[in-house]
Regions:
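ATP/NTP phosphate-donor binding region
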Residues: 1-89
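Solvent-exposed alpha-helices and their adjacent loops that cap or buttress functional pockets
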Residues: 8, 83-85, 108-109, 137-138, ...
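Residue-level signal for inorganic ion chemistry
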Residues: 19, 35, 119, 157, ...
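Short glycine/serine/threonine-rich phosphate/pyrophosphate-binding segments
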Residues: 97-104, 240
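A glycine/threonine-rich phosphate-anchoring loop and its flanking beta-alpha core
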Residues: 104-194
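Active-site segments that bind and position negatively charged phosphate/pyrophosphate groups
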Residues: 193-299
Length: 355
């Protein structure tokens, strides 16, 4: 079993515990408990929750259309009707969408109720579970409302990945790839040597490595004032692509494409060598992205990038790699020149996109 990680926060310190069986940990939680459960998790592991009173469970349909303030307020109303008080604990099982809703509601209700998180997707295990950040969508725009409110403890049982679909499994790999590129060279080389699917026993190692890298960044810049912005690597274009496809592609898959776009632009800006761009691209194509993405209206994607929260005036703070494999924040003006580079990217990567 992997060693736990202790995360230092200006709000309070919290721990990531790597566990063998979530059922044992769940049974050991004491006090007054209320549960926020991904419906899919409940259906797959119903027997594990058999001893819980149904009226204490708020079921989540984990789709982007539900990641809004309407769902947050529904959960808060559920807390009120159940009689939840400050000394209760909110127990959350699910991926990033369920996490976002539980974070926001727990933070707002009674000015903070403690919550605990069992991430059940690879994406939430290897990235979103730490850092305390949540994002709530407004209309078609992603993550326009948010707070920083970390769980009191995170319990990672990697056996949950055994029941993930191939698409959901792929979702987490963009974040692992991101951290491998910015860690020591050995991490990236290890990842390159792996097959597309890694068993539970081995994947825990990569989850731990990725979280350890993220821990360094969020402890130095918890509230995203500067350094933490580098964690948006791949997300700027990824979020725009999600919105463009009306969430037909999943977040993690969009981020992997976003990493490829960011690397292409970094090469064109002279920040990295072409060899690094092509090497990462080859890994992405072999292990991650095997389907074609159709972009008929690149100008629409570019316009969606303009709505990114990192835009100031007409300048975007773009997270990119440099030659030392460090993530940096590189300002780029959202003008005709950048749009032309984006279109050039689409034209030169026709095996990924059809523009």
């Amino acid at each position: 079993m992997m060693e736990h990680l202790d995360i230092h926060s200006n709000l309070y310190d919290y721990r990531v515990s790597f566990i063998d069986d979530f059922r044992t940990t769940l049974a050991q939680l004491g006090g007054e408990l209320v549960y926020v459960l991904d419906w899919n998790v409940y259906r797959l592991y119903e027997s594990a929750f058999a001893g819980i009173e149904r009226q204490r469970i708020f079921f989540m349909d984990p789709v982007e259309e539900k990641k809004n303030m309407y769902t947050v307020l529904n959960l808060i109303s559920f807390f009120q009707q159940l009689g939840v008080r400050k000394n209760w604990k909110v127990i959350c099982f699910g991926g990033g969408i369920t996490q976002d809703i539980a974070t926001m509601a727990s933070n707002l209700f009674l000015r903070n109720v403690d919550w605990y998180f069992f991430p059940t997707t690879l994406l939430s295990m290897c990235d979103s579970c730490i850092g305390g950040k949540c994002g709530i969508n407004v209309g078609a725009y992603k993550n326009q409302i948010g707070v920083f409110y970390p769980p009191k403890e995170i319990f990672i049982d990697a056996h949950f990945i055994d029941t993930l679909s191939p698409a959901d499994y792929l979702n987490g790999w963009g974040e692992i790839l991101k951290f491998s590129l910015t860690s020591d060279a050995a991490f990236y080389e290890e990842l390159k040597a792996e097959s597309s699917y890694i068993p539970c026993e081995r994947i825990t190692y990569y989850i731990h490595r990725g979280l350890a890298e993220k821990k360094k960044i969020i402890e130095a810049d918890e509230f995203e004032s500067d350094l933490r912005r580098v964690l948006n690597y791949g997300h700027t274009f990824g979020h725009a692509l999600e919105a463009y496809t009306k969430h037909a592609i999943a977040h993690g898959t969009a981020v992997i494409w976003g990493i490829d776009v960011a690397n292409y632009l970094a090469w064109k800006e002279g920040l990295i060598d072409e060899s690094l761009y092509l090497d990462v691209k080859a890994l992405i194509k072999r292990a991650f992205l095997k389907e074609e993405m159709v972009i008929d209206e690149p100008h629409t994607v570019f316009d969606l990038i303009r709505t990114d929260k990192k835009v100031r005036g007409n300048t975007l703070s773009f997270a990119m790699l440099d030659r030392k494999s460090h993530l940096i924040v590189h300002p780029m003006v959202l003008d005709a020149s950048l749009y032309r580079k984006f279109c050039d990217y689409l034209e030169t990567t026709h095996d990924y996109y059809r523009a």
